[in-house]
Amino acid sequence: MELENIVANSLLLKARQGGYGKKSGRSKKWKEILTLPPVSQCSELRHSIEKDYSSLCDKQPIGRRLFRQFCDTKPTLKRHIEFLDAVAEYEVADDEDRSDCGLSILDRFFNDKLAAPLPEIPPDVVTECRLGLKEENPSKKAFEECTRVAHNYLRGEPFEEYQESSYFSQFLQWKWLERQPVTKNTFRHYRVLGKGGFGEVCACQVRATGKMYACKKLQKKRIKKRKGEAMALNEKRILEKVQSRFVVSLAYAYETKDALCLVLTIMNGGDLKFHIYNLGNPGFDEQRAVFYAAELCCGLEDLQRERIVYRDLKPENILLDDRGHIRISDLGLATEIPEGQRVRGRVGTVGYMAPEVVNNEKYTFSPDWWGLGCLIYEMIQGHSPFKKYKEKVKWEEVDQRIKNDTEEYSEKFSEDAKSICRMLLTKNPSKRLGCRGEGAAGVKQHPVFKDINFRRLEANMLEPPFCPDPHAVYCKDVLDIEQFSVVKGIYLDTADEDFYARFATGCVSIPWQNEMIESGCFKDINKSESEEALPLDLDKNIHTPVSRPNRGFFYRLFRRGGCLTMVPSEKEVEPKQC
């Protein structure tokens, strides 16, 4: 019914706009949900957590923030942090400004007249850096050795002092909270957005923070029937491993009675297939296509850095966020390639598989560069290179075209666009752009990307050429999304529990910590950034009393009569739509 779709969309849009609660979608009980434990309760975590400087002080967002707050209390350490921040700004500076920016950093931090220089960085390293900055086109990595020395200094005695500070105790409190169990009640659930191989995808919202996600539900019986345990666990582990601005992130993994759930970055702008074929004439202008291609190149580079080949590049797997940036989604066919090895597998989608995949030959990352060529072609031309949109043709015929035919180019393509497509769609993988030893760096150097500053792109500092309508829901109507049939004859037993335990591991550190910071919950709770007190309770004999909800007269009356059992009160009633 049309009414059902309107209601489902209205609830989703209201949730996206922070329509529930006073704090952008937070539950009325968000502070109770995010209550930090006394420090004494974190003693086991203090001893068991790996004391890795890079992870605790740089990669993990809350750890990075608290380590910097600690450094701010000591002038020498604060100076090092200011230097590292200045270098980060240098690395994303425009090419024409980079030399002046770098020389000003040297003058600011290594001037002989300074009262607070950085003596830990040797003069010869500074001199070499200065010479590099005076070149015509200074490298973005001119300060690489300086930053390495600075981090080596911070990972020594300063890191040890940090571990004895109240800031590290606060970090442990947040890590304790991060490791608490995740259930379906952690979220509000909204309308179905689509469906995958093992189940549906619906929108959801974290009650504590108001953060919106997409929940991919893998039906347990369907997984077991299709023997998909390895595939499901592989996708989960790859998503957990990859932290990229250009690949959907896994934030939570949990289970219900009937499903295994992956909670992923929600992409409200729809997929590229919808935008290519449903908004005006098929295809994009070249500027827009090149921008998306640049972001895809960065995403593939991040995957290949972890030795992962994606193998399923196609428009419906590329999603747009609220601002119009893209991310690669659906990593069900991705696989990790051991160092020095190659893999074989005829997997992918008809019309997008590379010749070496069609021929069932061994490969590493070459299929993804072929896939990028297919996508660039389709974004500009308005159909894929070897199969027109909605063309009725057998898959065997499409495979023959991929192996034997040469793609045709219309007037829509500039010479640079033709060039990169031809180089990426080279039949021989050893001669294909990106596969000749240069990897993503070689693809980025193609003239079609001459106007793209990749450093600024990777830092999320470039505006996309298109911004989705924030009041639109870019997916099929609820009733147009085909529902799964009931799986019969499959029974779950205790033998399946080991697999479920390996899958349902709760929060993923970096996305969860980013959520706490971006939602403002970290700022509101953390004593260093607000006036609210933290339960730092360094005395192990002090215990924080558990607050109990106020009970009414009739509750107390029936309680005395033994008619009631103790259950948590739930005062908030919130919409639920799925």
Curated annotation (Swiss-Prot):
Q: Name one Pfam family in it.
A: RGS
This enzyme's EC code(s) = 2.7.11.16
Using the record's annotations, give every residue carrying the modification Phosphoserine: 485
The segment(s) forming the Protein kinase domain are: 187-449
Q: Name one GO biological process term.
A: regulation of G protein-coupled receptor signaling pathway
Residue limits of the AGC-kinase C-terminal domain?
450-515
Where would I find the RGS domain in this sequence? 52-172
Q: Which residues carry this modification: N-acetylmethionine?
A: 1
Q: Which PROSITE patterns match?
A: AGC_KINASE_CTER (PS51285), PROTEIN_KINASE_ATP (PS00107), PROTEIN_KINASE_DOM (PS50011), PROTEIN_KINASE_ST (PS00108), RGS (PS50132)
Catalysed transformations (reactions): [G-protein-coupled receptor] + ATP = [G-protein-coupled receptor]-phosphate + ADP + H(+)
- Keywords for this protein: Acetylation, ATP-binding, Cytoplasm, Kinase, Lipoprotein, Nucleotide-binding, Palmitate, Phosphoprotein, Serine/threonine-protein kinase, Transferase
Name listed for the protein in its UniProt record: G protein-coupled receptor kinase 4
Look up and give the organism this protein is from: Homo sapiens (Human)
